[in-house]
């Protein structure tokens, strides 16, 4: 080395010399060799070592850095995204006697843009004595890459005013900025400029146009640009395949992959594999995915983090978790995204414990979980028994400071909702309510509905209105369901007016919700008016009104509407048949109902559910054909559930068939030993038939096994305020007055009835 220096030879860089940068620099004696050494390091992509050599040279010598070396150092900072070093070198340039020109300034602009310091870039740009096309393009690129599309567009217009003609690089940057701003009109103008200035043959501009049209959801335009490129490159194919995959044209994405492979010119990269595998996931076609997996192996990309991650996600979404795990284990250097995919795959397929186990492996492997990791893990905690595990995850979230992430807080809310802990839901929501978004509000409103707290839901909605968060169609759906829960037609009408005022009423989802609300609140006329006003009625619209008619006792109207639905060419679904079977039951059309039940599968391909079976049991039982109802249950292909047996039990009570009621109750208690309804109905039947001994035995059994009747609840609306009452409520603020009035009414009833009825009333009162 010393001989080379004495001879004034150019400095060449080897790996061994890189390991000892300081010692190498300390042996350099001339300014020329110092500059050559730094340039050589930069050229060999040893950016950190080049910057260290610069620091060492400045501290230990008075060598003058040349213009070309400054350019190399600035490029090193750009490539390594080292903003601090870039500023340091820029300051050194300003304080030196270096006569720097537009080329150096352009490199400085590019460095600041790539490092994300747009303020510095703009300051340099504004003070440049001379600016050329590269200067403008560098700053426009910086704005575009950092999500400031509007600023990029303003600067581009200023560039045109200075009579600078954009080249393909300028077009590439400004088209990307236009795509991020979602300005379709400007995008079309830029496309016209590309054609006018004959840049349409340049790949950079053309590929940018494809990406822009994909961003605008205009795949036909993207496809026209793609097929107008005479010599496509890998980016062209990658952009069009990604576009089709992202926008739901999965078969087209796979078709373009096949077309690309047929030319035999390009080998897919990890990004093309990722887009193609996403298409397979959306189609739920693991057979296609496994073929692409074979291509990945052939291309030696199966161990690549991006391709491996996509493979893992595809197998997990298609339910092949063992394959997903094998692919994950083959990834050479898994990153956080790879871990997140396998955790999400397990969680979304219901393997909560396995997801937690992989999460623990992730942490023990030295990876720090991010918000996606935690959200995926929380998705697995969907049952009350998972509450303890969910709380542990909550403690991790607090420990790692993720409570500031709103998406994580929303996932926590959802977890507590599924795990039936409304108290924790409320406490958590109050902690971040001031920062809540529409997802947060909708989640807490849904939680209230799921836990039968419609009045609390309405209170929270009023708070939402005074917040900065605007209700959306999901909010309206929750409100309408809440109105149904408390049977408040007045409140439902107010929600209807609010949806009209906010412009949400025209949405199909809202209209269907309004039909349901009006029907269940007893205003079938208004429900029908909304139905008739709809331009595009879907199966939900028809089914909702049919069910509404049926449940309100208008069976004939429901069946007429069902015929109209079939005439309109709308294929019924399982909900439709619940409605028509209920209608047949209410109007006593037993044979018609049995015929419809038979045609469900033969004509419409709908497999009967337990709900349909329950409707048939009700149909037969209401007609007094209890033995047929019993035989139907015994011959069911599905295992009868509590609802089916309860339907029979209720019918037995109406028909006074104690023997069959006993069988129904026993089957209910086999499934749910603590079911209070079975005990109470059977007890009531024994009392009604004068069998006081068996009634008393049942009552004693309930007390022994701590079986408690679910307290009834009712609402009353007085002066726009909803009052809620529970049976045996000890917390109501006016409970003493309420119970005094009830006691007086009860005493009056006992005084005015005959002795036989008096005994029955006393027993009912004692059994609750």
Swiss-Prot record:
Residues 1-70 form a transit peptide. PPR repeats lie at residues 30-60, 66-100, 101-131, 132-166, 167-201, 202-232, 233-267, 269-303, 304-334, 335-369, 370-404, 405-435, 437-471, 472-506, 507-537, 538-572, 573-608, 609-639. Residues 720-750 are annotated as: Type E(+) motif. GO terms for biological process: RNA modification. One of its GO terms (molecular function) is RNA binding. It is found in: Mitochondrion. One of its GO terms (cellular component) is mitochondrion. PANTHER family: OS06G0611200 PROTEIN, OS07G0578800 PROTEIN-RELATED. Belongs to the PPR family. PCMP-E subfamily. This is Pentatricopeptide repeat-containing protein At3g53360, mitochondrial. The gene is PCMP-E86.
């Amino acid at each position: 080395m010393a001989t080379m220096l004495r001879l004034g030879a150019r400095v060449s860089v080897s790996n061994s010399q890189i390991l000892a940068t300081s010692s190498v620099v300390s042996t350099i004696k001339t300014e020329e060799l110092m500059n050559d050494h730094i340039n050589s390091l930069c050229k060999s992509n040893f950016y950190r070592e080049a910057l260290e050599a610069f620091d060492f040279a400045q501290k230990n010598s008075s060598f003058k850095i040349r213009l070309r070396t400054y350019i190399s150092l600035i490029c090193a900072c750009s490539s390594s995204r080292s903003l601090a070093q870039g500023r340091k070198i820029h300051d050194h340039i300003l304080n030196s006697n270096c006569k720097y020109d537009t080329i150096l300034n352009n490199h400085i602009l590019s460095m600041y843009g790539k490092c994300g310091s747009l303020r510095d870039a703009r300051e340099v740009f504004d003070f440049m004595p001379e600016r050329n096309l590269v200067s403008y393009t560098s700053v426009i690129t910086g704005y575009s890459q950092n999500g400031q599309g509007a600023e990029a567009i303003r600067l581009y217009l200023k560039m045109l005013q200075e009579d600078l003609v954009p080249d393909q690089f300028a077009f590439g940057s400004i088209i990307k900025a236009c795509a991020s701003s979602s300005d379709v009109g400007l995008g079309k103008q830029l496309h016209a400029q590309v054609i006018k200035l004959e840049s349409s043959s340049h790949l950079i501009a053309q590929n940018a146009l494809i990406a822009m049209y994909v961003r605008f959801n205009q795949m036909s335009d993207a496809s026209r640009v793609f097929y107008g490129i005479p010599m496509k490159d890998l980016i062209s194919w990658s952009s069009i395949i990604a576009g089709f995959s992202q926008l739901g044209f999965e078969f087209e994405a796979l078709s373009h992959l096949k077309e690309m492979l047929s030319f035999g010119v390009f080998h897919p990269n990890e990004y093309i594999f990722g887009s193609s595998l996403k298409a397979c996931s959306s189609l739920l076609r693991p057979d296609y995915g496994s073929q692409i997996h074979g291509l990945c192996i052939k291309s030696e990309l199966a161990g690549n983090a991006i391709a491996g991650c996509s493979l893992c996600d595809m197998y997990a979404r298609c339910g092949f978790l063992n394959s997903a795990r094998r692919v994950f284990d083959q990834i050479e250097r898994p990153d956080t995204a790879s871990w997140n995919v396998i955790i999400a795959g397990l969680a979304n397929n219901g393997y909560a414990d396995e997801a937690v186990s992989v999460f623990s492996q992730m942490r023990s492997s030295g990876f720090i979980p991010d918000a996606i990791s935690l959200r995926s893990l929380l998705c697995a905690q969907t049952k009350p028994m998972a509450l303890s595990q969910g709380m542990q995850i909550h403690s991790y979230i607090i420990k790692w400071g993720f409570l500031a992430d709103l998406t994580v807080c929303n996932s926590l809310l959802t977890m507590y909702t599924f795990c039936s802990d409304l108290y924790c839901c409320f406490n958590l929501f109050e902690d971040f309510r001031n920062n809540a978004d529409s997802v947060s509000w909708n989640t807490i409103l849904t939680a209230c509905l799921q836990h039968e707290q419609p009045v609390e839901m309405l209170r929270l909605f009023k708070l939402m209105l005074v917040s900065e968060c605007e209700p959306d169609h999901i909010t309206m759906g929750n409100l309408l369901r809440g109105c149904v829960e408390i049977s408040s037609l007045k409140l439902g009408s107010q929600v209807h007016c609010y949806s009209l005022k906010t412009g949400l009423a025209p949405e199909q989802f809202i209209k269907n919700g309004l039909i349901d609300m009006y029907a269940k609140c007893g205003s079938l006329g208004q429900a029908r008016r909304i139905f008739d006003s709809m331009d595009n009625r879907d199966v939900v619209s028809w089914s909702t009104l049919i069910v509404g008619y049926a449940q309100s006792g208008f069976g004939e109207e429901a069946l007429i509407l069902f015929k109209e639905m079939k005439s309109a060419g709308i294929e019924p679904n399982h909900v439709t048949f619940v409605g028509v079977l209920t209608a047949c039951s209410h109007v006593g059309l037993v044979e018609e109902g049995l015929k419809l039940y038979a045609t469900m599968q033969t004509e419409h391909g709908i497999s009967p559910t337990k709900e349909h079976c329950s409707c048939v049991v009700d149909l037969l039982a209401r007609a007094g054909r209890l033995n047929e109802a019993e035989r139907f249950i015994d011959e069911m292909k599905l295992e009868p559930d509590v609802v089916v047996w309860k339907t029979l039990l209720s019918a037995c009570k109406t028909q006074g068939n104690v023997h069959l009621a006993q069988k129904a109750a026993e089957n209910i208690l086999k499934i749910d030993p603590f079911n209070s309804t079975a005990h109470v109905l059977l007890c009531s039947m024994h009392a009604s038939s004068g069998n006081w001994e068996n009634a008393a035995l049942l009552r004693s059994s309930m007390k022994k096994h701590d079986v408690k009747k679910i307290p009834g609840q009712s609402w009353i609306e007085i002066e726009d305020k909803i009052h809620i009452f529970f049976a045996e409520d000890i917390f109501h603020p006016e409970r003493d007055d309420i119970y005094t009035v009830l006691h007086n009414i009860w005493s009056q009833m006992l005084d005015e009835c005959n002795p036989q009825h008096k005994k029955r009333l006393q027993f009912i009162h004692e059994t609750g």
